[in-house]
């Protein structure tokens, strides 16, 4: 084998031995990025054994100076880690791994859900044509094409294009006036 070919093979072998391409499973260990750039640290056993990565850059669908989509994983979550140009010193987290049975409710082919680890929920429901905000302690706001409903405990407020109803019709406000249940009192027409 010629000397040039041997050197080329040696360099290629060294490059392959020190560079890691593709995606690797990782576990988040830190999200407190001191530079506030959505970076994380993770354990990546297949590549780093027991060591923790350096700060992994975020690969986000929308980001810029002072704007973007920010959804950091929680410490302990599974993430996909890759390395820029295969360099172990330049990790990138490119997404999260959904654990078995881990998809949040509600579920459906045309239902998009964002749920925080604290239970705050945003539901974009194309099947029922509504948007819902849900607080883990019970508050709920549902916006549909023809109705908006706010619930908190035993209280409920419904608003349609023609009326506002409190507590299942106990109080109604319409363009004609205000009425109490069973017309006990009316103001207006």
Describe every region a protein language model picked out:
Residues 49-70:
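Beta-strand/loop nucleic-acid-binding surfaces
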Residues 1-9, 13, 70-78, 83-189:
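Right-handed beta-helix
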Residues 20-34:
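Structural detector for short beta-strands of small beta-barrel domains
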Residues 35-43:
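Short aromatic-glycine-enriched beta-strand elements
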Residues 11-17, 27, 61-65:
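Asp/Glu-centered strand-loop micro-motifs enriched in Gly/Pro and often flanked by an aromatic residue
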Residues 43-49, 53, 76-80:
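Catalytic cores of peptidoglycan-degrading enzymes
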